[in-house]
Amino acid sequence: MTNDSLPQLKNSLEEQGVRYCLPSYVDIHGVSKSKFVPISHFDRMMAGSELCTGAALDGVPQDVSDEEVSSHPDPESVIILPWKKDVAWFASDLWCEGKPFEPCSRNIFKAILA
């Protein structure tokens, strides 16, 4: 999916009644972490606006003074939650300082598969 098709994805989600997005990543222990983002912030979310302090994530090798980690949702992974139809879930890659964050589980799997 290209950036040009993101407005169509947003429109489709809104037409299906989605009010919130849930960009999600998996921590080192296999636990899913996410944030609720209003659909009105979709464009910013897809550009990586959702931040978290890497030092607060268990198992992530960062200090408190390090750059925050941003969540970059994968538009190909989107699903509308069957039990909560106004929420769209996205698998996300973590980025730090403008590049993929090595400890991110999706980035590790991508490297293994490459």
Predicted regions located by residue number:
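ATP/Mg2+-dependent ligation/transfer catalytic cores
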Residues: 1-114
